[in-house]
Each structure stands twice: as structure tokens, then as C-alpha cells.
Amino acid sequence: MTDLEEIRRKKMLELQQKAQQQAMEAEAQEQMRQQLEMQKKQIMMQILTPEARSRLANLRLTRPDFVEQIELQLIQLAQMGRVRSKITDEQLKELLKRVAGKKREIKISRK
């Protein structure tokens, strides 16, 4: 084998090892994401009534980022011990109104 072939072979092995390592890291990240998602789902089942969960699921179809924000707030409240009983659909509606009310409205008036 010539020096050039040896260099090519080493470089190819290096690239294959890098690709394997990246694939393993991506798989580990995906598993971590799935595990966190399952934990979040379990917490939401503990703190929300079925109707409230259904409302969030429907809202997730149109505004996934907004629902993510609400879920994180609910989880934080639960972890701080501020959720005494399951949150009902009516309570969730009020929370959604308060959070959505913070959004700025931009009005354009034409002359």
C-alpha cells in the first residue's frame, strides 16, 4: 500500500467514527427529549382534568408554542406547590385569557 492509500484509509476511518459518534449523540438527545416529554405528560395528567387536557390538546394544533409556554407555567406552579387540586377547564380558560391578554395588539390606522 502506498502512503496516499494509507492516508485515505485513515481519513475514511476517522470520518466513519465521527459519523457513528454523531449518530449516537443524536439518538441520546432524542431519548432524553422523549423522556422529558413523558414526564411532562405525566405531570399534566396529575394536575389537569380530562376536559382541560382536551382543551390544551386542541389548542396545541393551532398554537403549539403558546401551549408549550402554558404547560411550563403549570408545571412550575405544581412544583412550587401552588396547585392544590386538579385544574378544571374553567380555571384553564381563565389562565389562557390572562396569558393571551398580555400579548400586544398592533393597530394600523389609515388616513
Swiss-Prot record:
One Pfam family of this chain: dsDNA_bind
GO MF: DNA binding
GO CC term, one of those recorded: cytosol
Role summary: DNA-binding protein which can interact with a randomly chosen 20-mer of double-stranded DNA.
Protein name in UniProt: DNA-binding protein MTH_1615
Keywords assigned by UniProt, alphabetized: DNA-binding
Entry similarity comment: Belongs to the PDCD5 family.
Species this chain originates from: Methanothermobacter thermautotrophicus (strain ATCC 29096 / DSM 1053 / JCM 10044 / NBRC 100330 / Delta H)
Superkingdom of this protein's organism: Archaea
